[in-house]
Curated annotation (Swiss-Prot):
InterPro entries: FtsK/SpoIIIE/SftA (IPR050206), FtsK_4TM (IPR025199), FtsK_alpha (IPR041027), FtsK_dom (IPR002543), Ftsk_gamma (IPR018541), P-loop_NTPase (IPR027417), WH-like_DNA-bd_sf (IPR036388), WH_DNA-bd_sf (IPR036390). One of its GO terms (cellular component) is plasma membrane. Consists of an N-terminal domain, which is sufficient for the localization to the septal ring and is required for cell division, followed by a linker domain, and a C-terminal domain, which forms the translocation motor involved in chromosome segregation. The C-terminal domain can be further subdivided into alpha, beta and gamma subdomains. The alpha and beta subdomains multimerise to produce a hexameric ring, contain the nucleotide binding motif and form the DNA pump. One of its GO terms (biological process) is cell division. Coiled coil: none annotated. Its main location: membrane. This is DNA translocase FtsK. It comes from Haemophilus ducreyi (strain 35000HP / ATCC 700724). CDD domains: TrwB_TraG_TraD_VirD4.
């Protein structure tokens, strides 16, 4: 490439042209500075031009420079030197701080107007305070005009005040904010203080500051509260390098936290760490510390005094303390304070100790046993009183519970039992060394007795025993509270990526500019505006090439940004944040949701929580390869329902071929059947769901409503009227009672299949038919389906399933073909894993990128245990019962034939009618009784099994 071509390439783009203009302004300012430095009033210039001085030019810049500087002196007087200095300084500042990157013409016009006000004010002040020269006025033509116009009206003092006001306004809006910021930063640097003012870019652009008031003012990295001191120093240094992004106007940045939030987080952090950072006695202990053992055997023994000597080495930390012998019934005496004579303050033993000084200091602690006496008798008396009060309170609570459950006699027997009386002599016996040392026990003799109340090892026990909660629903206290996370991204990083992105697109002949930037917890979206005539598919085809040039793992390009005429390019953040389930469930979107079946998925790319309604989906297909976060996403959906709904509102049928994914939910009261791990039983569960769907449709049709919401409203109305609705499908032969049972509200049913591919392989077409029927009809009766698979291939996700399940979620997949199989669109192959997903809602052409919420296995276990403590599940055996089981139950009733059996057999053989409805009409029987007679005839080989159309053949003719 030649020098001319390189020069032309550097001039491409608006920013480069503006920078070139700044260079010209700087050169012109330097030229005027030289002209001002060599100015002579005798030069042949504008104010002194004559034939006498025609050839007299002493100025180093020639006639042009002499004329220009003479004009400035003529108009501004002594203020003329300000113009060349400002032009030169402004050009240098604009090039150093890259003003061209956020250039706007209105800012230039504002600064030009402010500069003119500044010059007018300075000229007025000069005309009042400075004497006139023999060659020009002190304030020039401008100052003289102000004198002649305003001196007679407001006088010299008024003119001075007015000029000062004009100068102050012009100075502030022209460059005053910049100089103030520089002065504050210089002062803070001089006294080694951390800058707290706004950055230079923000100060130099007052309009941008006002425009972006609600955008982030600072970006900080919040270090861990328990980090090492040198890590804290590293974080502080990194924090000082982060700058404000609010003034970065092109592209506009959204999604960064406000300064108030960050300052609040920083204040909390400082409060938590105030003691370790300011206490010189804190030190880091890496050796094993032998905790003190207190001898309470004899009152005459004395408690030790502590003395601490600080040395200059950190080789060994040895603490030797006296032994412990417990004599009384109180086995855990508490030492509240120990006087530390070196500092005359209590010495606390922190659970986690951090160094707070540069040079390590090793404290040597020695304990002497001959200093201060300890009043053992008073402590023992106080502890005995506290123990007695606690024991009385415990017995009172036990008595109240016994009365509530009607077990007063049992309680009295327990209280009066002689085995519970413990003599003081036995409790005060001194324990032997064998008793104090558990390793001396005979493990072999105690092993058959089991572990507490069970013979199972604690780690092999499936469910933890939890006390019954008092709240109607689980609380968020079951989830761990995680530290607040902040974006660790700078304005410079955002601009550099934008600049590299524009250059990378230009390399492929795609002219586009970055207009907006949206910073999220996991990815950052750069919204670009392609030039006229550039098609969107030309940009999307460059995804892999752009990822390679920008050195990202993967990028995703969206053709349409909702509500904007831009395309979106999503790039991964260097420091990825974790989206915690507690943060999503604690959001306003989930707390105040009006959804019938609310499910929290995570957060979108802007960090906003996403909550969907399962009742409106109405079914969901989830696919993604191993490690993409599919199982965690399923757990997130289940836990969202468990936090919001009771077993009366929603019931689950869970199918888990992997055995370990959903087994943690066994025995929660929401289940209709234990978690199904056998694929044959899984097919039976789907078949039961189809039968339940038909039964519900029959009930809904009798109540003349259209869906489950209308049905439940009718039941509520009947309950309010105190007139329950009798079951319209009941027949006298269905039960022993003479009256039909009342109808009750129907709960929603959610079927969850964790590995759909395994189910298809084992059951095949039968399962697909059941799923198709459920997906087509079950929405109105409150039965919803969630299918998850690791293998998004066309033989698993068939066209029939896709047609009936419009709502889909795609986690990370291997290829674009798999992405199109799930979503009918690409993009899932460019996801980042660990919960990164694409969500396609039913009836919406938009595909939303969501970062799935994360929770630990312990949190899932705690929530399941919480529900198990609330009640036991009411399982239905018919859910997983097979045809053979039903046939066995039917054969047990065949021995007792119906009294009308012979008459109906004769009618069937004569007429050939084999349908239940025909038997009902002919003999005026109920549906269930007629069905039983048909089953009895089938068992006796009188009629055949139903064929394809449900028709039976008569075999006994």
């Amino acid at each position: 490439m030649t020098v001319i071509e390189r020069f032309k390439s550097n001039l491409k783009g608006k920013q480069n042209l503006i920078n070139f203009g700044f260079i010209l302004i700087g050169l012109f300012g330097c030229y005027l500075l030289i002209a001002w430095a060599s100015y002579s009033p005798l030069d042949n210039a504008w104010s002194t031009a004559s034939s006498v001085t025609h050839d007299t030019v002493l100025n180093k810049t020639g006639k042009l420079g002499a004329w220009l500087i003479d004009l400035l002196y003529a108009f501004l007087g002594n203020v003329a030197f300000v113009v060349p200095f400002v032009l030169f300084s402004f050009a240098i500042y604009a090039l150093i701080f890259r003003i061209a990157e956020q250039w706007k013409w209105r800012n230039l016009l504002l600064q030009i107007g402010s500069f003119i006000l500044l010059l007018i004010g300075l000229s007025g002040i000069a005309s009042v305070l400075l004497p006139n020269s023999a060659y020009y006025l002190a304030g020039g033509f401008v100052g003289g005009m102000l004198q002649s116009l305003l001196n007679g009206i407001i006088g010299q003092v008024g003119l001075l005040l007015l000029s000062t006001v004009l100068m102050s306004i012009g100075f502030y809006f022209c460059s005053g904010q910049l100089l103030f910021s520089l002065g504050i930063q210089f002062y803070q640097w001089l006294f080694i203080k951390k800058p707290q003012s706004n950055t230079i870019l923000e100060a130099a652009n007052p309009h941008l500051n006002a425009q972006n008031n609600e955008t982030t003012k600072s970006i900080v990295a919040n270090p861990s509260e328990n980090a090492h001191v040198d890590q804290l120093v590293t974080h502080e240094n990194a924090t000082e390098q982060l700058t404000d992004v609010s003034a970065f106007t092109r592209p506009t940045i959204h999604g960064l936290k406000s300064s108030s939030t960050l300052n609040t987080d920083k204040t909390k952090y400082n409060q938590v760490n105030a003691q370790p950072l300011t206490d010189p006695m804190m030190f880091k202990i890496e050796k094993k510390v032998i905790l003190p053992k207190i001898n309470m055997q004899h009152p005459e023994n004395e408690l030790t005094n502590l003395s601490m000597e600080q040395t200059n080495s950190i080789d060994n930390l040895e603490i030797r303390l006296p032994k412990v012998h417990l004599n009384t019934a109180v086995t855990n005496p508490e030492i509240k304070t120990v006087e530390h004579h070196a500092q005359n303050r209590p010495l606390e033993m922190p659970t986690q100790i951090q160094p707070v000084f540069d040079q390590p200091i090793t404290p040597t602690i020695s304990l002497n046993v001959e200093d201060q006496p300890l009043d053992i008798e008073s402590n023992e008396a106080q502890l005995a009183e506290e123990f007695a009060a606690a024991e009385q309170m415990r017995l009172a609570n036990m008595e109240q519970r016994a009365k509530a459950e009607g077990l007063e006699e049992t309680f009295n027997q327990i209280i009066t039992s002689p085995t519970l009386t413990v003599s003081i002599n036995e409790s005060s016996e001194q324990p032997t060394e064998k008793d104090l040392n558990p390793t001396h026990h005979d493990n072999g003799a105690n092993y058959p007795k089991g572990y507490g109340k069970t013979l199972l090892h604690p780690l092999l026990q499936r469910n933890n025993v939890v006390e019954k909660p008092t709240t109607p629903l689980p609380t968020l206290e079951l989830l761990a509270k995680n530290p607040v996370q902040t974006q660790q991204i700078t304005e410079q990083e955002i601009f550099d990526t934008s600049h590299r992105l524009e250059n990378a697109l230009a390399n492929y002949n795609v002219k586009a500019t970055v207009e907006d930037v949206l910073v999220g917890p996991v990815v950052t979206r750069y919204e670009i505006k392609p030039a006229a005539g550039i098609k969107a598919n030309k940009v999307t085809a460059l995804a892999n090439d752009l990822a390679r040039e920008l050195m990202f793992k993967a990028i995703r390009i969206t053709e349409v940004v909702p509500g904007k005429p831009y395309m979106g390019i999503e790039t991964p953040n260097t420091h990825r944040q974790t989206v915690w389930l507690r943060d999503v469930l604690d959001s306003e979107a989930f707390r105040h949701t009006q959804a019938t079946l609310p499910m929290a998925l995570g957060k979108d790319i802007s960090g906003q929580p996403i909550v969907v309604d399962m009742a409106k989906m109405p079914h969901l297909l989830v696919a993604g390869q191993t490690g993409g976060g599919k199982s965690v996403g399923i757990n997130t959906m289940i836990l969202s329902l468990l936090f919001k709904l009771t077993p009366e509102q929603v019931r689950f049928i869970m199918i888990d071929p992997k055995v370990v994914e959903l087994s943690v939910y066994n025995d929660i009261p929401h289940l209709l059947t234990p978690v199904v791990t056998d694929m044959k039983k899984a097919a039976n569960a789907l078949r039961w769901a189809v039968g339940e769907m038909e039964r519900r449709y029959l009930l809904i049709s009798h109540l003349q409503v259209r869906n489950i919401e209308g049905y439940n409203d009718k039941i509520d109305q009947a309950s309010a009227m105190n007139f329950p609705i009798p079951d319209p499908t009941w027949r006298p032969a269905d039960s022993i009672g003479q009256l039909p049972p009342p109808l009750t509200k129907l709960s929603y049913i959610v079927l969850i299949v964790d590995e759909f591919a395994d189910l298809i392989m084992s059951a095949g077409k039968e399962v697909e038919e059941y799923i198709m029927r459920i997906a087509q009809k079950a929405r109105a009766v409150g039965i919803h389906l969630i299918l998850a698979t690791q293998r998004p291939s066309t033989d698993v996700i068939t066209g029939v399933i896709k047609a009936n399940i419009p709502s889909r979620i795609a986690f990370t997949v291997a290829s674009q073909i798999d992405s199109r199989t799930i979503l009918d669109a690409g993009g899932a192959e460019a996801l980042l894993g660990r919960g990164d997903m694409l969500y396609s809602a039913s009836g919406s052409p938009e595909i939303m990128r969501i970062h799935g919420a994360f929770m630990s296995d312990e949190e899932v276990q705690r929530i399941a245990d919480n529900w198990r403590a609330r009640g036991k599940p009411q399982y239905l055996d018919s859910v997983v019962a097979s045809h053979e089981d039903e046939n066995d139950s039917r054969t047990n009733t065949i021995t007792e034939l119906d009294p009308l059996f012979d008459e109906i057999v004769a009618y069937v053989i004569e007429s050939g009618v084999t349908s239940i409805s025909g038997i009902q009409r002919r003999f005026s029987l109920g549906f269930n009784r007629a069905g039983r007679i048909i089953d009895q005839m089938e068992a006796q080989a009188i009629i055949s099994e139903p064929g394809k159309g449900g028709k039976r053949e008569v075999l006994a003719r």
